[in-house]
From Swiss-Prot:
<feature type="coiled-coil region">
    <location>
        <begin position="935"/>
        <end position="962"/>
    </location>
</feature>
<dbReference type="GO" id="GO:0007219">
    <property type="term" value="P:Notch signaling pathway"/>
</dbReference>
<dbReference type="InterPro" id="IPR043145">
    <property type="entry name" value="Znf_ZZ_sf"/>
</dbReference>
<feature type="binding site">
    <location>
        <position position="112"/>
    </location>
    <ligand>
        <name>Zn(2+) 1</name>
    </ligand>
</feature>
<feature type="binding site">
    <location>
        <position position="88"/>
    </location>
    <ligand>
        <name>Zn(2+) 1</name>
    </ligand>
</feature>
<dbReference type="GO" id="GO:0008270">
    <property type="term" value="F:zinc ion binding"/>
</dbReference>
<dbReference type="InterPro" id="IPR000433">
    <property type="entry name" value="Znf_ZZ"/>
</dbReference>
<dbReference type="Pfam" id="PF00569">
    <property type="entry name" value="ZZ"/>
</dbReference>
<keyword id="KW-1003">Cell membrane</keyword>
<feature type="binding site">
    <location>
        <position position="100"/>
    </location>
    <ligand>
        <name>Zn(2+) 2</name>
    </ligand>
</feature>
<dbReference type="GO" id="GO:0014069">
    <property type="term" value="C:postsynaptic density"/>
</dbReference>
<feature type="zinc finger region" description="RING-type 2">
    <location>
        <begin position="866"/>
        <end position="901"/>
    </location>
</feature>
<dbReference type="InterPro" id="IPR042056">
    <property type="entry name" value="MIB1/2_ZZ"/>
</dbReference>
<feature type="repeat" description="ANK 7">
    <location>
        <begin position="631"/>
        <end position="661"/>
    </location>
</feature>
<dbReference type="GO" id="GO:0034451">
    <property type="term" value="C:centriolar satellite"/>
</dbReference>
<keyword id="KW-0479">Metal-binding</keyword>
<feature type="repeat" description="ANK 2">
    <location>
        <begin position="463"/>
        <end position="492"/>
    </location>
</feature>
Length: 1006
């Protein structure tokens, strides 16, 4: 039976659109929460292969642990015959069927259900496949919605893993825009995307049909929102799973004492007076939230959220089985007992004869659970069920009894021990238990009364917690003051090693921390995970508690068991406000965690630009930006490796990071960016002045890497076209011709080739050889690309990089002055930020990228007459401000720009801005290629920055080693507080000059 079900899931699941599931532990492989993928195939009943819309393909678990949820199974073609969506009229419903539990015969398809059609207060049954068990869901009004992202209308895409449509897209790497999600076939809805390619072509492509993925998104789009917890888990027979073993529809009781329940409810929905009905009434599990807390509905119609540890599952006990437990008697029902009505229609009709008889209106009660309201003299039962009352034969119902066993789940042992302790305490009636409960509830009078009794232990525990800890977490300051007067142990630990100050940080109780500090509590105390209260406050996002702890002298840089400091945690939680507070308090940015990442590394790895901006703005020492990990990676290496462009820009421009640092493999950040084909990072590093000819441990330069990657991609394309291993030796010449031909087929379309050309155009050496004696050109079998590289390099050497344009710009002044688009009007529009002039004002709005340098056009300024003489048109570009407001004669007299008052460092002639060569000093030219304007000054700027860093580093070393009092002698005496001076100054002092603590002992350094 299990095998047939597994086979069915495997067949029916292929093509389903999925999102991450409840047991997901694979980081951002999918692109992040809400990103969508396609089930490609099943490796086994336990493993499924998914291709995410971002192109990542991997195996995931679908048995035992469940990594995926089904967002839409319509592409699989599963249909529910005889049904119709009552909103969009789809007939039959294909995919998941959503049936209203409160309306008669009302169904929705997946799109309409997640699109909030029908009443949001109504609960629905989810029917995943025809004939499968229907699952009752929480109403959508109370459920969490998240946004789906991936290949939807508006997404930018390239060809994907299953592409087989030749060059419809214009060639590998060409992009297109998804205009609509459509049906590949009538039996497979939502399984294709209609794409308009940049070359003008448009067509329909598979996204889910038979598990195929013709597309990969490079820029995802929103696909509407969906109810995450309502989506079925892929591979699971019953979607209502829960670590506590409870499922939607289960009957549950509360068998614990009121005070214990109230204690366990902290952090799990809390307790209100209206919940007293739950102590004597059996409820039905109607939902399981994202924190695995249980939502229970009661006969009154109320719904309450519970900690799973509070609830006991009620099992069905047949009357015959119960009778065996009695001594020769039959099962005796009592008023208030829960009973389940017999499922068998024919049997119950027979049993009801002479016992109230059978009525067709009783049909909905079959299999339902009700409560005994009255027991008649003939033993017949009056049962309240389904909102009405009926008389039943005792033999037609089964008694429902609570199970006596402990809760069984993954963390069951821990919960069982907790409950056992609670029961033991309950039975003993210990005063310590009453004290803890009173402290937790803020009952000052009761606490005062209990503390007067001689046999109470102020440090006694209940459920592993002391009164001090309970009061701290709940913010009961008055009780804390009472306990402190009784010499309570403020450092007492619970089972997790948490002290009262940890509990206060967890509960966001700044006032409690202040009281504990006055009571001499250790604010740097660590629990069993080596976390300080500051760690906990940062992780919970309690900014005021963080500030309070730091104000009272809490150490800002202690490490937990994983080596993370509060800085690491603030970066992970994306709390820039907390990060800034920690840095202002002197948190150490250089401390590394167990993986070797300091705070800068961590922010670069996470791709968190806002955190990086805060870190760089508050760095105590600028050279920290170049700190290496054990493997030699700096923060810039990590940003380049992971294509975090914004982070890399901050490191380069704000942090002045050294661009040429090498890791243990002697690779620079540029090596890594080229190797991973991260074009934007490559452009950023080259323009910032990264050296292009640094060799790694194999002697390879970035240009070697680019050409090797290009050649390998060409070979892979060749292998897709024919089986290379079977080519006969006689065909060898034609094979070489084919390899060469691939280069001419689309060299400029491939990012590796374009990166290689970009490097060559910016001066990369074509002749440098690696340790195998290979030059970059030796790694390129494509003669067309070799010629292009040589041409780019030659143009760079001859200073004509600007002539690398499709139009082959002539230096003829008339040609340079005419608009490159219409050729009718003269050029009169300045593009920013590149500073080129390529079009007239009429054509400029249509230009998105500069026609000379291919940079994105961010601003367009029409060139007016000279603001000084008003006789001629403005013809000189001022740098660095980028304004053109004066003619050649007037511009030569200016020291500052008349428009913005910025100092003029360079003057660029009009002809140079148009892409031509000026007859003036080359130092005044603006490059028309992809080279920064200030190329000449770059080396001097870098040298000055390096000298400044060294000066600051020397000053920092002096501050650490010199006596802070006299500033003349070396520090060679240390006090017990940790500070120090020189011996001469130290011998004359009675208190530390830094912290003002009394000097108890002086220790000389040797």
């Amino acid at each position: 039976m299990s095998n047939s079900r597994n086979n069915r899931v495997m067949v029916e699941g292929v093509g389903a659109r999925v999102v991450r599931g409840p047991d997901w532990k694979w980081g951002k492989q999918d692109g992040g929460e809400g990103h969508v993928g396609t089930v490609r195939s099943f490796e086994s009943p336990e493993e499924v292969v998914v291709v995410w819309d971002n192109g990542t393909a991997a195996n995931y678990r679908c048995s035992g642990a469940y990594d995926l949820r089904i967002l839409d199974s319509a592409p699989t073609g599963i249909k529910h015959d005889g049904t119709m969506c009552d909103t969009c009229r789809q007939q039959p419903i294909i995919g998941i069927r959503w049936k209203c539990a409160e309306c008669t015969n009302y169904d929705l398809c997946t799109v309409c259900y997640h699109g909030d059609k029908h009443h949001l207060r109504h609960r629905f049954y989810r029917i995943t496949t025809p004939g499968s068990e229907r699952v009752l869901l929480e109403s959508r009004r109370k459920s969490k919605k998240i946004t789906a992202r991936g290949i939807f209308a508006g997404a930018r895409v390239v060809r994907g893993v299953d592409w087989q449509w030749e060059d419809q897209d214009g060639g590998n790497g060409r992009r297109g825009k998804v205009t609509e999600i459509q049906d590949w076939s009538a039996s497979s809805p939502h399984s294709a995307a209609y794409v308009l390619w940049d070359n003008g072509a448009k067509n329909l492509y598979r996204v889910g049909f038979e598990g195929m993925s013709d597309l990969k998104c490079v820029q995802d789009a929103k696909g509407g929102s969906f109810y995450r917890d309502h989506c079925p888990v892929l591979g699971e027979q019953n979607g209502n799973r829960n670590p506590g073993g409870l499922q939607i529809g289960d009957l549950v009781n509360i068998d614990l004492d009121l005070e214990i329940v109230q204690s366990l409810q902290h952090g799990h929905g809390g307790w209100t007076d209206g919940m007293f009905e739950t102590l004597t009434t059996t409820g039905t599990v109607c939902g399981i939230d994202e924190d695995h807390d249980i939502v229970v509905q009661y006969p009154s119609g109320n719904r309450w959220t519970f900690n799973p540890a509070v609830l006991t599952k009620a099992n069905i006990v047949r009357s015959g089985d119960a009778a065996q437990g009695a001594e020769g008697g039959t099962s005796q029902f009592q008023v208030g007992d829960l009973v389940q009505v017999c499922y068998d229609l024919e049997r119950i009709k027979l049993l009801q004869r002479g016992h109230g008889e059978w009525a067709e209106a009783m049909l909905p009660t079959l299999g339902k659970v009700g409560r005994v309201q009255q027991i008649y003299s003939d033993s017949d039962l009056k049962v309240e069920v389904c909102g009405t009352s009926w008389t039943y034969n005792p033999a037609a119902v089964s008694k429902v009894a609570p199970a006596g066993s402990a809760i069984s789940n993954a963390s069951g042992e821990r919960l069982s021990q907790l409950l056992k302790k609670l029961f033991e305490t309950q039975e003993s009636g210990d005063l310590n238990e009453e004290l803890v409960k009173a402290a937790a509830n803020g009952d000052v009078a009761k606490v005062e009364d209990l503390l007067k009794r001689p046999d109470v232990d102020v440090n006694g525990q209940c459920a592993g917690h002391t009164a001090m800890q309970a009061a701290s977490q709940n913010g009961h300051v008055d009780i804390l003051k009472l306990l402190l007067k009784q010499n309570v142990d403020v450092e007492a630990e619970d089972k997790d090693g948490d002290r009262a100050v940890h509990h206060a940080a967890f509960g966001d109780e700044g006032a409690v921390i202040e009281v504990l500090h006055r009571g001499s509590a250790d604010l740097n105390a660590r629990n069993k995970r080596r976390q300080t209260p500051l760690h906990i406050a940062v992780n919970k996002g309690h900014l005021q508690v963080v500030k309070t702890l730091l104000d009272f002298g809490c150490h800002p840089s202690l490490q937990d068991s994983e080596g993370d400091t509060p800085l690491h945690d603030a970066i992970s939680k994306k709390r820039d406000d907390i990060l800034a507070v920690l840095l202002e308090a002197g948190a150490d940015v250089t401390i590394t965690n167990n993986n070797g990442f300091n705070a800068l590394h961590h922010a670069a790895l996470r791709g968190n630009p806002s955190a990086m901006r805060v870190l760089l703005s508050k760095l105590p020492r600028p050279w920290i930006v170049d700190e290496k990990k054990d493997d030699g990676y700096t923060a810039l290496h990590l940003a380049a490796l992971n294509n975090h462009v914004e982070v890399a820009e901050l490191l380069v421009h704000q942090g002045n990071a050294n661009l040429d640092i090498q890791n243990v493999n002697q690779q620079t950040a540029l090596h890594l960016a080229v190797e991973r084909q991260h074009t934007q990072i490559v452009r950023l590093l080259v323009r910032a002045g990264a050296k292009l000819d640094i060799q790694d441990k194999d002697g390879d330069t970035p240009l070697h890497e680019a050409l090797r990657h290009h050649t390998l991609s060409q070979l892979r394309q060749l292998q897709d076209m024919q089986d290379v291993g079977k080519v006969d030796a006689a065909w060898e010449p034609s094979k070489n011709t084919l390899i060469m031909g691939l280069g001419t087929q689309g060299a400029e379309k491939k990012s590796a080739a374009s990166i290689a050309c970009f490097l060559a155009a910016n001066g990369a050496d074509l002749s440098i050889r690696n340790k195998k004696g290979q030059s970059p050109l030796d790694l390129c079998p494509d003669p067309s690309l070799c010629k292009a590289l040589a041409k780019c390099h030659k143009e760079k050497v001859s200073g004509q990089v600007g002539s690398r344009s499709p139009s082959m710009i002539s230096n003829d002044s008339e040609t340079l002055e005419e608009c490159m688009v219409c050729s009718d009007m003269k050029r009169d529009t300045l593009f920013g930020p590149c500073g080129h002039i390529a079009t007239c004002s009429l054509c400029s709005p249509r230009v998105k990228k500069c026609l000379i340098c291919k940079e994105q056009v961010q601003s367009r300024t029409k060139i007016e007459e000279c603001v000084v003489c008003s006789d001629k048109k403005a013809a000189v570009l001022f740098q660095p401000c980028g304004h053109m407001c004066a003619c050649e004669n007037c511009a030569s007299l200016m020291k500052k720009c008349v428009q913005c008052r910025a100092v003029v460092e360079r003057r660029v002639p009009f002809i140079t801005c148009c892409g031509g060569k000026s007859s003036e000093d080359p130092s005044d030219e603006i490059s028309s290629g992809n080279i920064p304007v200030l190329q000449k000054d770059k080396d001097n700027t870098n040298v000055n920055a390096d000298v400044q860093k060294l000066q600051q580093q020397l000053q920092d070393i002096k501050e650490q080693t010199m006596c802070p009092v006299c500033l003349d002698r070396l520090k060679n005496m240390i006090f017990l507080c940790g500070h120090g001076t020189c011996q001469l100054c130290g011998d004359r002092m009675s208190e530390c000059p830094i912290c003002r603590k009394a000097i108890e002992r002086r220790i000389l350094l040797y």
